[in-house]
Design a protein with these regions (language model features):
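Feature captures hydrophobic
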Residues: 1-103
Length: 103
């Protein structure tokens, strides 16, 4: 999978905002092929597949930061794969959207 430099830059910026507002290791947020971070306080994951994972494309991440209330719709459409009891990041994206400068 080829990386788009513009998408890579925006993904990095968005993930830095997420880490700032929701530090921790309870959820692994994966944006292949760009990056993966651990976020949300309340636990730490060290090895293997974490119990709470969220995965989406870079384009979906960018769409979500611009339309943060679309979390549940994007999950239902299969654009976001979220598994685990603590994998609902919808409110984190609502907060993150207020800090994203490209609005």
């Amino acid at each position: 999978m080829q990386k788009d430099p513009q998408v890579a830059s925006e993904v990095k910026e968005i993930l830095n905002i997420i880490k700032e507002i929701a530090p921790g290791g309870l959820v692994e947020l994966r944006i292949p092929p760009y990056a993966a971070i651990q976020c949300v306080a309340g636990g730490n994951h060290k090895r293997g597949t974490p119990p709470n994972t969220v995965e989406m494309s870079g384009q979906v991440l960018i769409q979500l930061i611009k339309e943060p209330r679309s979390w549940h719709k994007l999950c239902a459409q299969g654009d976001i794969a979220a598994s685990g009891i603590n994998s609902d990041l919808s409110q984190i994206f609502v907060i993150a959207a207020t800090k994203y400068p490209a609005q």
